[in-house]
From Swiss-Prot:
The keyword Endoplasmic reticulum applies. The gene is mnn9. It comes from Schizosaccharomyces pombe (strain 972 / ATCC 24843) (Fission yeast). GO terms for molecular function: mannosyltransferase activity. It is found in: Endoplasmic reticulum membrane; Golgi apparatus membrane. Pfam families: Anp1. This is Mannan polymerase complex subunit mnn9. The lineage of its organism: Eukaryota, Fungi, Dikarya, Ascomycota, Taphrinomycotina. SUPFAM superfamilies: Nucleotide-diphospho-sugar transferases (SSF53448).
């Protein structure tokens, strides 16, 4: 009788455990960890299978354990950039980092500084480490010794931004994993963002979404990134008379386009969650669903509808049927040279 009762109790406990497990899997949303199955064959070799249908890109990325890839082309290392990156409160076990630095004398210095910063984190407590970090070194001709004024000269833009587009594509295609849900492009000179940057942008659940980038000059806020805009009839007419290899640029007196610039419509005390449709974007703080890049939306290195690099990317994403948006009252801050 005692044996019978013991067996009955064990059976009931197993039944309850199975019931709890069933309910858990029934009501728990599918997460990216379910998208990968690792199989080892008899020869000791292993391979991985990813069910891409289970990769979620949702408005609640933490709950759904969605992996984020933060990508930064880096010609100069700003400690404030790294400090701000470490203050992001998205779970680090869901964050992978990708950097690309120039293979030059200046690049070697940047590489050392970046590695030192990474090592301090990755050799620390396990719960403070990033899931994965990759540094690429490549010839890019993007000099870290140029001043901000030199980098933004009108005459230098087509060549400079074409090279930057190639650099971005190399970084993206070398680091994007099958399990990645979101790609956050974060420029190396962005030194201040809300700690909830990833969650705030993902909450809108848009295909492409960019924050508004300003500089702080004392108590004064100055708009910085003019690559996020709504197209104008004037710009379209200018483009219609251009040679196929010419590009339209924004923010230059030499080429007035009269586009609506997101940076110019910022007002204090407005709702930071306000969203607007855009035709062009910058990459200072740009969140992209990984599926958009997988669809083929990259950064054109050549004039694409007379646009190049990030603005060309926005055009390409829209041509592929994806939505492109901005947050005019949600600010991130650029290093003030």
């Amino acid at each position: 009788m005692r044996v019978y009762n013991k067996s009955r109790i064990v059976g009931q406990l197993l039944f309850v455990a199975l019931g709890i497990t069933f309910i858990y899997y029934l009501f728990t949303p599918s997460v990216n960890s379910n998208a990968k199955v690792q199989i080892e064959n008899r020869g000791g070799n292993s391979y991985e299978i990813y069910d891409m249908n289970k990769i979620t890109e949702s408005s609640d990325p933490i709950r759904n354990k969605e992996e984020v890839l933060i990508l930064t082309p880096i010609a100069r290392f700003y400690p404030q950039y790294w400090k701000n990156l470490l203050e992001l409160d998205y779970p680090r076990n869901l964050i992978s980092l990708g950097f690309i630095v120039p293979s030059s004398k200046d690049g070697a210095k940047v590489h050392r500084e970046l590695r030192n910063a990474i090592n301090a984190v990755q050799k620390g407590p396990g719960d403070k480490r990033f899931a994965d970090v990759k540094i690429l070194i490549q010839d890019s001709d993007l000099s870290s010794g140029q001043s901000e004024a030199e980098r933004h000269k009108f005459s230098a833009q087509k060549e400079r931004r074409g090279k930057l587009a190639a650099t971005r594509n190399t970084l993206l295609l070398s680091t994007l994993k099958p399990s990645t849900s979101w790609v956050l492009w974060l420029d190396s000179d962005i030194v201040e963002t809300p700690s909830t940057l990833i969650q705030d942008l993902a909450e809108h659940n848009e295909d492409v979404l960019v924050a508004n980038c300003f500089q702080k000059q004392g108590d004064k806020l100055t708009p910085y990134d003019f690559n996020s805009w709504v197209d104008s009839q004037t710009a379209q007419e200018l483009a219609s008379h251009m040679d196929r290899d010419e590009i339209l640029l924004e923010g230059y007196a030499e080429l007035p386009t009269y586009r609506m610039l997101m940076a110019k419509i910022y007002e204090e005390h407005k709702d930071p969650s306000t969203i607007m449709a855009l035709d062009g974007v910058g990459t200072t703080a740009l969140l992209v669903k990984a599926s958009v890049h997988r669809d083929g939306a990259l950064f054109p290195t050549f004039p694409f509808y007379h646009l190049i690099e990030s603005e060309g990317f926005a055009k390409m994403a829209k041509r592929l049927g994806h939505g492109v948006y901005g947050l005019p009252y949600y600010l991130v801050f650029h290093h003030n040279e």
